[in-house]
């Protein structure tokens, strides 16, 4: 979705890719043609129009030398891509090539990856995961030629049909099969919400494992007569076909463990027995409110070198009814820093909130996050202004990501004041898996004491996005007990059943 400083837009961009190295080893022409068809079909399955699509190609071939056969491989690929563009009515506007894909006696497979891009409307975007149990599943396929390539005219009509069905809200989810055929498509569609498939009586299992380029699997929002029936989604995380059952949990485990030896997705501790976590509950009976109300509170959002979500933060505050003021900290010279300190002190004096947004202030150097923000707020003038806001004017502070790390390291969390911290104080440290994590997680409200959570109830579960390398909160047992008692544990991670977990 394209951001705008003020207002709302539904314009968004989409990008998809297509390539199959196994086909490329057999026929460079067919591989390139299908790469174009696949990349555009992926856009269509997401809710974009093929008429708005443009292409860019990434080409990578073995060193050509004086071998005519080697020279013929990129030529065949380009001919396949050109025919696809002409016949399907979509043009490439950029690309990059390399003819150095050889090392001693090892050559890369002939490679032409098609990237398709398009602008669209967020109202039409659909995601690929199954949404509901009991939904009808159908397969729409174009006419084929040469046994592998879709007929161009038939595929263009199919693109238009799928686009219309999505715009008319008759599709809950959509997917176009690629390298793994229909089996891969149905399996991946079931992953997100762990839904299975009950195949229609007499469904030919052989269809699951062949190529189906240009086809579409649709989860229908209503029972309409379109396509070839596949079956229906089920709450049971299994495939049921011709009296046999396949456990998808085991398939998922095998799928996710493929790269486990080189890129672990869980720690050794997580693979063992799960650590128990109590379900915390703290319901605030009395709330602190400012002595003097403000119809449109002012929010100061300081931007440090490396901050990267100040626009999103300001937008969220603006939509909630506040008046955000974004101020860029100038650290070019010591004199500029002093000027910024004076300006921020003045801005805090006329604000009701301070919002520290996320990012990588100072490049997360040296040796850790938020050190520049922490140093800035420990300036005596800023410390005094913050104390005046929080302790005398009943103001608020909020920190997200890098900003929350600063609140921890300043002592504002959990002590409510800028203090000198020591080894006994809570901190945020590196994830146990040893690398950055970016995913959707489920959290449960444990306490609604915070003004930011006053309209929630303990036990409410939300799905939120996380993206961090240092997201592990660490504190001593005594400190944790005190935080629990005071209602300062705001949320807990939970599993799919809503049970608190330390995983």
Per-region residue spans from a language model:
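Intein/HINT protein-splicing elements and their conserved insertion hotspots or analogous self-processing inserts
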Residues: 1-9, 19-24, 69-76, 91-212, ...
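General beta-strand structural signal in soluble alpha/beta enzymes
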Residues: 14-16, 55, 93-95, 116, ...
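Glycine-rich anion/phosphate-binding loops
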Residues: 22-38, 376, 380
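A glycine-rich phosphate/pyrophosphate-binding beta-strand-loop-alpha-helix module
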Residues: 29-101
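N-terminal beta1-alpha1 cap of cysteine-dependent amidohydrolase-like domains
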Residues: 242-400, 404-415, 429-437, 474, ...
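Amide-donor transfer/coupling interface in amidating biosynthetic enzymes
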Residues: 339, 346, 385-388, 420-503
């Amino acid at each position: 979705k394209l951001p705008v400083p003020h207002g709302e837009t539904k314009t968004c961009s989409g990008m998809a890719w297509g390539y199959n190295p196994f086909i490329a080893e057999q026929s460079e022409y067919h591989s390139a043609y299908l790469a174009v068809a696949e990349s555009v079909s992926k856009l269509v399955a997401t809710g974009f129009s093929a008429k708005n699509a443009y292409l860019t190609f990434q080409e990578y071939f073995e060193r050509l030398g004086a071998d005519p056969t080697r020279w013929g491989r990129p030529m065949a690929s380009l001919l396949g891509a050109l025919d696809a563009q002409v016949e399907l009515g979509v043009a490439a506007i950029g690309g990059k090539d390399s003819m150095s894909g050889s090392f001693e006696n090892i050559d890369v497979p002939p490679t032409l990856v098609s990237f398709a891009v398009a602008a669209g409307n967020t109202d039409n975007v659909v995601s690929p995961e199954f949404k509901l149990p009991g939904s009808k599943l159908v397969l729409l396929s174009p006419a084929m030629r040469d046994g592998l390539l879709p007929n161009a005219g038939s595929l263009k009509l199919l693109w238009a049909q799928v686009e219309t069905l999505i715009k008319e809200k008759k599709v809950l989810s959509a997917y176009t099969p690629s390298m793994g055929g229909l089996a891969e498509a149905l399996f991946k569609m079931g992953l997100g919400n762990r839904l299975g498939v009950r195949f229609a009586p007499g469904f030919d299992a052989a269809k699951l494992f062949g190529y189906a380029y240009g086809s579409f699997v649709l989860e229908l929002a209503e029972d309409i007569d379109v396509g070839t029936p596949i079956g229906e989604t089920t709450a049971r995380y299994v495939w049921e076909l011709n009296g046999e059952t396949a456990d998808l949990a085991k398939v998922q485990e095998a799928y996710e463990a493929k790269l486990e030896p080189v890129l672990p997705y869980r720690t050794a501790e997580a693979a063992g027995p799960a650590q128990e976590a109590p379900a915390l509950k703290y319901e605030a009976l009395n709330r602190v409110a400012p002595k003097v109300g403000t119809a449109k509170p002012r929010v100061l959002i300081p931007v440090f070198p490396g901050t990267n979500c100040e626009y999103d933060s300001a937008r969220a505050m603006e939509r909630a009814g506040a008046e955000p003021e974004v101020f860029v900290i100038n650290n070019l010279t010591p004199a500029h820093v002093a000027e910024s300190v004076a300006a921020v002190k003045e801005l805090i004096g006329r604000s009701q909130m301070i919002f520290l947004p996320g990012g990588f202030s100072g490049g997360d150097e040296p040796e850790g996050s938020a050190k520049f923000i922490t140093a800035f707020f420990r300036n005596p003038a800023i410390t005094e202004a913050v104390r005046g806001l929080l302790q005398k004017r009943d103001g608020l502070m909020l920190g997200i990501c890098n900003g929350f790390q600063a609140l921890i390291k300043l002592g504002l969390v959990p002590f409510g004041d800028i203090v000198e911290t020591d080894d006994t104080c809570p901190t945020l440290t590196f994830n146990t898996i040893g690398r950055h994590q970016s995913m959707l997680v489920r959290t449960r409200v444990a306490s609604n004491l915070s003004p930011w959570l006053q309209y929630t109830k303990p036990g409410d579960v939300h799905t939120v996005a996380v993206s961090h390398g240092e997201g592990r909160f660490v504190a001593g047992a005594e400190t944790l007990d005190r935080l629990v008692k005071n209602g300062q544990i705001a949320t807990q991670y939970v599993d799919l059943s809503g049970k608190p977990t330390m995983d």
